[in-house]
Amino acid sequence: MDKSGSPNASRTSRRRRPRRGSRSASGADAGLRALTQQMLRLNKTLAIGRPTLNHPTFVGSESCKPGYTFTSITLKPPEIEKGSYFGRRLSLPDSVTDYDKKLVSRIQIRINPLPKFDSTVWVTVRKVPSSSDLSVAAISAMFGDGNSPVLVYQYAASGVQANNKLLYDLSEMRADIGDMRKYAVLVYSKDDKLEKDEIVLHVDVEHQRIPISRMLPT
């Protein structure tokens, strides 16, 4: 008797037929596995550059140089008339200035626009000798001499610009923490009056690590 026509044989034959979409599903699985491997490799690569206790992140965007950390200070410019200027010298905390011979590698300024911001400002950081003042005329000349980078930050109808950082490299100057009192942040309000509640400036000073007291205050 020929069993090929039996119900069991028919069911076996049906099971052995490739189901529709099995090949495309297999391809999708392979693609997913490949993507997973790529993500794992990327994650491993990124983990190498992630900050650690001994290698902190400088300004939340890149790692400090080995052996360095950073100190942040906040500046709130006052009201600045259209076409006028503002300058303020850097003032680091006493806990940092106590180690005035520690080298400084970079200064970074971050502009944080507040909800009312609708202006155009120019921002820079400059070494200003203690004998020099921060008058409007003096600051105007510093903006025009081209001796330091200038960040132009402005309001746009679609939102404020993404680039809000200015990086000033001091590594070749061998500047130290004690020199920071000779540096000043300068602001120029170009197109209109800058109100005092329009921007906040965050200044990050990357410097060599300083000793940390392990004793609790008594």
From Swiss-Prot:
InterPro entries: Cucumovirus_coat, Cucumovirus_coat_Asu_sf. It comes from the Viruses. GO terms for molecular function: RNA binding; structural molecule activity. Residues 12-22 have a biased composition (Basic residues). It is found in: Virion. The modification N-acetylmethionine is found at residue 1. Keywords: Acetylation, Capsid protein, Ribonucleoprotein, RNA-binding, T=3 icosahedral capsid protein, Viral nucleoprotein, Virion. Coiled coil: none annotated. GO terms for cellular component: ribonucleoprotein complex; T=3 icosahedral viral capsid; viral nucleocapsid. The N-terminal arginine-rich stretch does not seem to be the major RNA-binding region that allows formation of an infectious ribonucleoprotein complex. Belongs to the cucumovirus capsid protein family. This is Capsid protein.
